[in-house]
Amino acid sequence: MRSLLLWIAVVVCLLCSVAAVVQSGSSDGFGKPRDTETAISFLEYKLMAPSVPMIPLTLIHGADSKGAVCLDGTLPGYHLDRGFGSGANSWLIQLEGGGWCNNHRSCVYRKTSRRGSSKFMEKALAFTGILSNRSEENPDFFNWNRIKLRYCDGASFSGDSQDESSQLFYRGQRIWQVAMEEFLSLGMKQANQALLSGCSAGGLASILHCDEFRELLPSSTKVKCLSDAGMFLDSVDVSGGHSLRNMFQGVVTVQNLQKDLSSTCTNHLDPTSCFFPQNLVSDIKTPMFLLNTAYDSWQIQESLAPPTADPGGIWKACKSDHSRCNSSQIQFFQEFRNQMLFAVNSFSNSDQNGLYINSCFAHCQTERQDTWFAQDSPQLNGKRVAESVGDWYFDRAKNVKAIDCPYPCDTTCHNLIFE
């Protein structure tokens, strides 16, 4: 009964958030009112069964003494479901997503939400998909120690600075470090297998921190990384501008990310370019799996056709429901898909890496049960996402790389429709 009540509370909370978002509009596409991540989260929770187990929030006590705090100065937190049986010494770390804040206004706003303060985080979260503890839902990782690290810094667990006047703490890198120390003390230092994963902004974080994660663990530990919906592209928007580049430039500058970015990249590119994964993935030494839809819903909503690039609302219907797009709009999406394939081309040449690019209009497929491992889940070459990730991680197959044919050929997609 307690789990059911918690589940209802989470859904009601998300519904209220979405209603507020829809009513208030947006002035900059990335600031206070619009929250595409919240809308996507709500759509995902609608698909969730009430019987899903709820995992309580744990705050990292003492983190504040190391300056590892959320945007508002509160303690960071995580949810841990302990492993059992053959998975007792295996660890999966899932980095939460939730966009970014790129200026004073948007960062101050996040202080009043779970994206910037543990005061507003759910006290328990449902573990589904790659976090599920049921073998029929998560065949390869169900009995591992599974952790979801909450996201409250606004810069993909990167950055180390402070805005004294507004009491804003940009401490993503410190949160990452203190969380890893906590997990190592809980037993991860004895892990025989480990997987660093993440969705959206967390998927970008898994790319940024992959090699660092490898270095934390003994050389005898099998370590790999998974980025779900983390391939954010430096693309031109529908107005010919660079909405996401402008956004990332603000994040890098405001949160002082320069020193945390890959020196291999910053030696020849500007810091903003080195926050884009397309300029990072080929240089990662640790085995990495990239999972992404070719028509990523978040990027369509917020990078390709944000309100600032479409003031007349010509793209509003199309970006909410791809079935309402005209032929020229679909062609624009096909060009975006081509950019995605070009961005992963060099990465895919490595035998140790894995790839799964399906032609769906979705965002984050590892934590949704319907897209991770269900009877009617999306498939590529007859494999569901969970099966492909498992084949790659456990070396059950060689060259685990699959790229879908262009839209509309894939009939297995679970596309997101924004009402």
UniProtKB/Swiss-Prot annotation:
Q: Where does the UniProt annotation locate this protein? A: Secreted, Cell wall
Molecular functions (GO terms): hydrolase activity
Q: What is its main location?
A: secreted
Write down the EC number.
3.1.1.-
The signal peptide annotation in the UniProt record is 1-20
Query: Catalytic positions?
Result: S200, D296, H363
Knockout mutant characteristics: No visible phenotype under normal growth conditions.
Record's GO cellular component terms: extracellular region
Entry's Gene Ontology BP terms: cell wall organization
This chain is glycosylated at N133, N326
Q: What class of enzyme is it?
A: hydrolase
- What InterPro entries does this protein's entry cite? PAE/NOTUM
Asked whether the UniProt record includes ATP-binding among its keywords, one would answer no
User: What are the UniProt keywords, alphabetically?
Assistant: Cell wall, Cell wall biogenesis/degradation, Glycoprotein, Hydrolase, Secreted, Signal
Record's function text: Hydrolyzes acetyl esters in homogalacturonan regions of pectin. In type I primary cell wall, galacturonic acid residues of pectin can be acetylated at the O-2 and O-3 positions. Decreasing the degree of acetylation of pectin gels in vitro alters their physical properties.
Family of the protein in this entry = Belongs to the pectinacetylesterase family.
Protein name (record): Pectin acetylesterase 6
User: What organism is listed for this UniProt entry?
Assistant: Arabidopsis thaliana
Lineage of the organism: Eukaryota, Viridiplantae, Streptophyta, Embryophyta, Tracheophyta
Encoding gene, per UniProt annotation: PAE6
